[in-house]
């Protein structure tokens, strides 16, 4: 592969049918990669306990039905746990981790305390300050600890990092002591995605802008591990009329739902293209023309607000 080759990726979780918002982001990630003459990889983020095996194949079928293709075989995070363990071992050797016994409720209460709240969404550092004796007592309590990244000096608090986004420009976000490994021993999202993107040679990450706050953490971690940092492009989400993220309870929001209403995969593809301000196509095979004229600078910057039809029956 040439050093200049663009490598994009799509990384859904096989926990259910993809809805229109998922498919729209997949289409965008594919267009970014293919319009640059690059590769488009598929990775299943399947470390979540909510994974349901039947959705590996159904998600592949839905995306293929819209005319999107990918390079190589899809990979699964569940097959790559050794990579995550190696990364964690590296950070542990450098004394960049510590055990955390906090519950979500305890974190929320500590972050909101009047003696100096942490920035919104940031871990307040409770377990970082535990003495050895306190840590031993926590371990004896039987709660399996998570593993957090140690960011900066003990008295410094969360850091800030500015990243450049292809669609949104400069974004400054918090880099706190985020989780690397969950209490059940599984790699946490931020660690797994950084390790995977580097291992797969990903140069470009196109994803929903709900993940923008995670980007400074991921860039910081990649640099700590000596890994290449991809370019990022965060795109607006699909929302329902109430301004909330589209969900399956909102109506006919999956490809299967739309087919049951008598629509075709082409109808769904054109709906997605129209939402992006792109020309509609007469057949699935006409996507090459969209790729040829694709310009990310012309994409909408606002969410797509859409009210899907009711489910049939």
Tell me the role of every PLM-derived stretch:
Residues 48-58, 240-244, 292-300:
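Short, mixed-charge aromatic SLiMs
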Residues 105-248, 254-259, 308-313:
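Active-site cores that bind ATP or allylic diphosphates and position pyrophosphate for catalysis
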Residues 69, 97-98, 116-117, 133, ...:
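A general structural signal for well-ordered secondary-structure junctions
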Residues 1-115, 209-210, 214-227, 285:
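N-terminal Rossmann-like or analogous alpha/beta NTP/dinucleotide-binding catalytic cores
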């Amino acid at each position: 592969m040439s050093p200049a080759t663009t490598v994009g990726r799509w990384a859904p979780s096989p926990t259910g049918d993809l809805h229109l918002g998922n498919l729209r982001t997949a289409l965008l990630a594919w267009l970014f990669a293919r319009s640059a003459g690059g590769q488009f990889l598929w990775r299943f983020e399947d470390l979540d306990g909510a994974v349901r095996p039947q959705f590996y194949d159904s998600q592949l079928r839905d995306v293929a039905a819209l005319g999107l293709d990918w390079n190589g075989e899809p990979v699964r995070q569940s097959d790559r746990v050794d990579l995550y363990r190696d990364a964690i071992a590296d950070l542990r050797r450098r004394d960049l981790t510590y055990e955390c016994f906090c519950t979500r409720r305890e974190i929320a209460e500590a972050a909101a305390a009047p003696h100096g709240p942490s920035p919104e969404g940031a871990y307040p550092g409770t377990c970082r300050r535990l003495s050895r004796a306190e840590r031993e007592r926590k371990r004896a309590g039987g709660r399996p600890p998570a593993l957090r990244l140690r960011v900066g000096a003990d008295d410094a608090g969360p850091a800030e990092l500015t990243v450049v986004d292809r669609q949104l420009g400069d974004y400054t976000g918090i880099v706190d002591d985020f989780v690397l490994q969950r209490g059940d021993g599984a790699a946490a999202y931020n660690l797994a995605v950084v390790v995977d993107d580097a291992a797969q040679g990903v140069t470009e990450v196109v994803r929903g802008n709900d993940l923008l706050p995670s980007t400074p953490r991921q860039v910081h971690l990649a640099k700590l591990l000596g890994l290449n940092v991809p370019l990022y492009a965060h795109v607006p989400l699909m929302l329902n009329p109430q301004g909330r993220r589209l969900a399956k309870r909102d109506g006919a929001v999956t490809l299967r739902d739309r087919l049951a209403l008598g629509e075709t995969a082409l109808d769904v593809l054109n709906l997605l293209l129209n939402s992006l301000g792109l020309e509609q196509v007469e057949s699935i095979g006409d996507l090459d023309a969209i790729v040829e004229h694709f310009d990310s600078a012309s994409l909408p910057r606002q969410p797509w607000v859409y009210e899907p039809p009711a489910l049939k029956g």
